[in-house]
Design a protein with these regions (language model features):
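Secondary-structure transition/capping motifs at alpha-helix termini
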Residues: 71, 123, 172-181, 203-217, ...
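N-terminal Rossmann-like NAD(P) cofactor-binding subdomain of oxidoreductases
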Residues: 138, 228-230, 268-273, 279, ...
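N-terminal ligand-binding/catalytic initiation module
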Residues: 1-152, 409, 420, 426, ...
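Adenosine-phosphate binding glycine-rich loop
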Residues: 153-160, 173-176, 290, 294-422, ...
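Flexible, glycine/charged-enriched surface loops at secondary-structure junctions
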Residues: 127-132, 179-183, 208-217, 379-389, ...
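Short acidic, glycine/serine/threonine-rich loops at helix termini
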Residues: 22-23, 46-57, 88-95, 140-146, ...
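Rossmann-fold NAD(P) dinucleotide-binding segment
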Residues: 252-261, 270-291
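Glycine-rich phosphate/diphosphate-binding loop of Rossmann-like nucleotide-binding domains
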Residues: 150-151, 155-267, 417, 448, ...
């Protein structure tokens, strides 16, 4: 195995002190770090527990910070927290570079994360953005709750996923002509993503006039055991209990769809093919324009394909997926399925947090980002192609607009520490953007008179007369 260059900073459970972590962070050659993406490698999307091999996730996310939001590369730092791995295949691999031990959990793990957060802010400043990525659900929610009011931090798997899903729903309601608060939503999957989306849907419904209780009544969660009902509320977390329904126990999605007659069906279960033709047909039977989001990644784990979604609803569905699908041609019309990818959201959120030096990131930030994303979907995209997200080419401009909207909110909430407040936020943001394109140093084409050319090359001319 050849090691060519470092790609980020590794911090292990054996470095569990503020001073040691501070020392490790000080080894990073750039001093003006403003954005960190950190993972412990436990729940790498579609791959599971990769331990120390999870470093590619922070590196990739920060590459998108640069490409999609124009954040300066020198401001970015990828970090991997190595507390071991429960992947026996890696532990048995003689070339595995991480700690060879089972994952550390409990107080020692919590202390390491506390020390990490303190060390980061001591080394780089209290406004340093810290994005948590691909932590297991058992850690993701507690860490977000513990740090979000004291640090500039967010969890993309929870909040970013929620924001992009709600953006798609808001855009879809422009075609259904019904507010989100007037719809019933069924979730297949009640993990980080499902709960995050449900919570943000509640916030949108509250802004549309419902109480929190009324909003939660419109949301139905299914986990691996079926619909979450009050009869089995004791078997789920407090977060799930808020959505428990006073209904008979139903173990299959088809039962729930037939009983509830939802307007929206969202899949975050990683169960391939869970949205069967019968379920899709039932959605079409109950809705003129059913909304179906199969958001699980990768493509092999999507709840249904785009082709099946359009086929079994006779083209009526407003469909989005977590993974890319090809365009679908049916009944003489071309459908362009939208991809509900977090990259519509987190680059713009990060850009705002970094440029306006946010002390923390309020929850409403992600609703603001969702609304801006939804508003960026053109009428042509909606009406001609039934696509509920902007095209990928528009993401960089979308990130700028999200950053401006969030910047206004940060100052309203008193959590932006950049002073004085820029009068023209758009101008301020655009002045800070990093360009990854090389400007040509010479003209690509020279005009030479044909008479001065011999076999395609210019003939030198003498200055002598």
């Amino acid at each position: 195995m050849s090691f060519f260059h470092f790609r980020g900073v590794y911090i292990t459970i054996d470095d569990n002190s503020i001073s040691k972590i501070y020392q490790i962070l000080s080894n990073w050659p750039r001093k003006n770090v403003k954005a960190i993406v950190v993972t412990d490698g436990e729940r790498i999307l579609g791959l599971g527990d990769l331990g120390a091999y999870g470093m590619g996730i922070p590196v990739g996310k920060l590459a998108l910070y640069v490409a999609l939001a124009g954040i300066q590369p020198e401001w970015c730092l990828p970090v991997l927290i190595d507390v071991g791995t429960n992947n026996q295949k890696l532990l048995d691999d003689p070339f595995y570079t991480g700690l060879r031990r089972q994952r550390v959990r409990g107080p020692e793990y919590d202390q390491l994360l506390d020390n990490f957060m303190i060390a980061v802010t001591k080394r780089f400043g209290s406004e340093t953005l810290i994005q948590f990525e691909d932590f297991a659900s058992s850690n993701a929610f507690p860490l977000l709750d513990r740090y979000k009011n004291d640090y500039c931090t967010f969890n993309d798997d929870i909040q970013g996923t929620a924001s992009v899903a709600v953006a798609g729903l808001i855009a879809a309601t422009r075609l259904t002509k019904a507010k989100l608060s007037q719809t019933k939503i069924v979730f297949l999957g009640a993990g980080e993503a499902g709960l995050g989306i449900a919570d943000l849907c509640v916030e949108q419904m509250k802004d549309e006039g419902l109480t929190e209780e009324q909003a939660r009544e419109k949301i139905f969660l299914l986990n691996s055991k079926g619909l979450i009902t009050k009869d089995r509320a004791h078997t789920v977390t407090v977060r799930h209990q808020k959505y428990a329904k006073d209904l008979p126990q139903m173990t299959t999605l088809l039962e729930v769809v037939k009983a509830v007659k939802p307007n929206v069906l969202i899949g975050v279960s990683t169960v391939a093919g869970a949205f069967t033709p019968e379920i899709l047909g039932e959605m079409a039977k109950n809705n003129e324009r059913p909304i179906v989001f199969a958001l699980s990644n990768p493509t092999s784990k999507a709840e249904c394909t785009a082709e099946n979604a359009y086929r079994y609803t006779n083209g009526a569905v407003l469909f989005a997926s977590g993974s890319p699908f090809d365009d679908v041609e049916m009944n003489g019309k071309i459908y362009k399925p939208g991809q509900g990818n977090n990259s519509y959201i987190f680059p713009g959120v990060a850009l705002a947090a970094v440029l306006f030096k946010a002390k923390r990131i309020p929850d409403k930030t992600f609703l603001i980002a969702a609304r801006r994303c939804a508003a960026s979907v053109s009428e042509e995209s909606l009406n001609e192609y039934a696509r509920v997200y902007p095209s990928a080419e528009e993401i960089r401009e979308l990130s700028v607009n999200i950053a401006i909207d969030i910047g206004n909110h940060l100052y309203e909430e008193g959590v932006a520490t950049l002073h004085p407040e820029p009068e023209d936020k758009e101008l301020f943001v655009r002045e800070q953007l990093y360009s990854y394109e090389y400007e040509p140093t010479v003209n690509g084409l020279y005009d030479w008179p044909e008479t001065d050319c011999r076999v395609g090359f210019p003939i030198p001319k003498s200055n002598e007369h």
